[in-house]
């Protein structure tokens, strides 16, 4: 029996994001790698909201908002930025009392994570809009990951990202959710302790987007050529654009530039994402596109630096602001790797769920019966 994800979405089980269960699975529906040295967008045709990524050697790792779905913070792996598989999850279950683990809380919990690698360890920071900024870490991205640490408590803190500076100081940038904090459209920075487990200074607003960049959010923190850079979207999820802030001082003042917008492309509101580079010296940018019921799809854009400003996508008129590409040459990572895509079906021939499946709350033994010998998963109605 081959069952599609839609069969299980009728109950508490959620099938997005999709994952790879077997090696080099290739979708019959959507393949980004065109097999001719080019790729097409989106590179991930599934709901990976607020993606972030980092490179460690020849390997790339990505995570995204999982909200209330568990296992949360699924970890994807790629060798070439185009072909991806799921290798694990950083938050296998929700913890009490930080969470309400046995009841679905749609849209809550894990918002806009940032994944980083520092001194041999992987870190993931995220904001829980009702609790504050959290962090987990691991030596191996496949796990095990530590239990979440509340780095900075505060209602409305979202979209957190750390930065380890050359002088040993650690900073965290974040935004605010207006629905909880009664403030939005600002970017703030605080300093963390050396272990990156606790904020040691109050947050300071370094950018106010109310005039030119309403709904600025999703900041990602980088440093290059002596400049501190904050990449962030503005203008709203389905209709916005990408802005970059830069300053020689971590607390500013920051100057800004719009570096990516829809333009004449069909890619509405290119939203928050991640800057990554390749071992060969190329620069690339991930972002998502909101397409309503289909979710938030991940796109990959070429990127270059001009006068210490990033230009993302294709800058057709030379004004420093690019527009998204739909097809482009694949990143040069020095090698060619096999085509693979996240899995989108399941034979259910085991006695546990494959890693592409998620629940809306901690698993309850009353919810499902696994009969791998019959290729069956039977779901039960359950009041919540």
Regions found by a protein language model. Name each.
Residues 11-20:
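Hydrophobic h-region of N-terminal signal peptides that target proteins for export
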Residues 21-384:
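Carbohydrate-active catalytic/glycan-binding domains of CAZyme proteins
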Residues 1-10:
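Bacterial N-terminal signal peptides that target proteins for export
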């Amino acid at each position: 029996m081959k069952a599609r994800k839609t069969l299980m979405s009728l109950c508490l089980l959620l099938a997005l994001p999709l994952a790879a269960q077997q090696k080099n699975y290739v979708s019959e529906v959507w393949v980004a790698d065109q097999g001719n040295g080019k790729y097409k967008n989106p590179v991930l045709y599934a709901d990976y909201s607020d993606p972030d990524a980092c490179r460690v050697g020849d390997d790339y790792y990505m995570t995204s908002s999982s909200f209330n779905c568990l296992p949360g913070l699924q970890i994807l792996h790629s060798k070439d930025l185009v072909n991806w598989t799921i290798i694990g999850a950083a938050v296998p279950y929700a913890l009490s009392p930080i969470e309400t683990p046995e009841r679905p809380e749609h849209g809550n919990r894990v918002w806009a994570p940032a994944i980083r690698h520092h001194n041999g360890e992987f870190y993931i920071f995220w904001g829980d809009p009702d609790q504050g900024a959290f962090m987990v870490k691991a030596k191996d991205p496949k796990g095990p990951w530590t239990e979440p640490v509340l780095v900075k408590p505060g209602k409305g803190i979202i979209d957190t990202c750390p930065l380890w500076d050359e002088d040993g100081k650690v900073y965290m940038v974040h935004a605010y959710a207006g629905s909880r904090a009664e403030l939005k459209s600002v970017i703030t920075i605080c300093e963390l302790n050396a272990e990156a487990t606790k904020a040691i200074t109050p947050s300071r607003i370094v950018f106010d987007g109310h005039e030119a960049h309403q709904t600025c959010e999703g900041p990602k923190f980088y440093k290059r050529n002596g400049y501190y850079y904050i990449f962030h979207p503005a203008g709203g999820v389905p209709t916005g654009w990408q802005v970059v802030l830069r300053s020689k001082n971590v607390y500013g003042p920051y100057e800004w530039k719009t570096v990516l917008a829809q333009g004449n492309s069909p890619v509405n509101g290119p939203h928050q994402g991640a800057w990554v580079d390749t071992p060969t010296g190329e620069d690339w940018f991930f972002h998502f596109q909101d397409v309503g019921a289909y979710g938030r799809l991940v796109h990959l854009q070429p990127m270059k630096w001009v006068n210490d400003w990033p230009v993302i996508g294709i800058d057709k008129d030379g004004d420093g602001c690019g527009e998204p590409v739909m097809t482009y040459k694949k990143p040069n990572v020095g090698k060619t790797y096999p085509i693979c895509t996240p899995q989108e079906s399941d034979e259910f021939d085991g006695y546990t769920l494959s890693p592409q499946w998620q629940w809306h709350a901690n698993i309850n033994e009353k919810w499902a019966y696994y009969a791998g010998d019959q290729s069956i998963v039977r779901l039960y109605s359950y009041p919540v």
